[in-house]
Regions:
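Active-site glycine- and acidic-residue-rich loops that bind
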Residues: 15-19, 29, 88-95
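Conformationally flexible catalytic loops at phosphate/diphosphate-handling active centers
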Residues: 23, 27-78
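Short acidic, glycine/serine/threonine-rich loops at helix termini
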Residues: 47-53, 94-98, 121-126, 156-160
Length: 179
């Protein structure tokens, strides 16, 4: 179950139901979206659900270190040919307007994953596309790649970054497992 879910829990004792429910809802409402699974064994005991009433769980939002943001902004502004690579995390974060403002501010072309289509207006002059030779050409010419909301993993990122060792790559993602 762990391979198909964000989190998996097994309730081994009835008195642990509230603990597992809180953890499951915390995982649902925090970070990268994904399914959670709670396994409940055969009902061998009883549990009084009024003994520990459910309290709504507030999700958390990750935030980068402000000094890292300043350093990344400085690198982005100094780049000669920056490129923004967008993943589905931009959609999950409802950050499309902020992405558009950033791209326009630094005049950086934008490419996206298939799952991020729509995160940046496809009729915008800075939008390059998802795949194809033109995307490869922009990647090749870039001196800085700002990857936002994308894991850059080979299964999701259809283009390798040519000459990656000679480029500055800034990777911004809420899921630390994808950095």
């Amino acid at each position: 179950m762990k391979t198909v879910s964000k989190w998996f829990g097994y309730i081994d004792k009835p008195e642990r139901v509230p603990e597992f429910m809180r953890r499951a809802f915390t995982m649902l409402r925090s970070g990268r979206p994904g399914p959670v699974i709670l396994a409940v064994p055969d009902p061998t005991g009883t549990y009084d659900e009024t003994a520990d009433p459910y309290v709504t769980v507030k999700g958390w939002k990750a935030a980068p270190d402000p000094t890292d943001v300043i350093a990344a902004a400085d690198l982005l502004l100094k780049a000669q040919n920056p490129l923004i690579y967008v993943g589905e995390g931009v959609i999950y974060a409802n950050a499309s307007e902020e992405l558009k403002s950033l791209a326009e501010l630094v005049n950086a072309p934008v490419i996206s994953t298939l799952k991020a289509k729509g995160a940046f207006p496809e009729n915008h002059p800075l939008f390059v596309g998802v795949r194809g030779d033109h995307v490869s050409n922009y990647l090749d010419k870039s001196d800085l790649v700002l990857a936002v909301g994308s894991s850059l993993s080979p299964g999701r990122f259809s283009h390798g970054i040519p000459n990656a060792a000679t480029k500055t790559i800034i990777h911004c993602n809420v899921d630390e497992l994808h950095v």
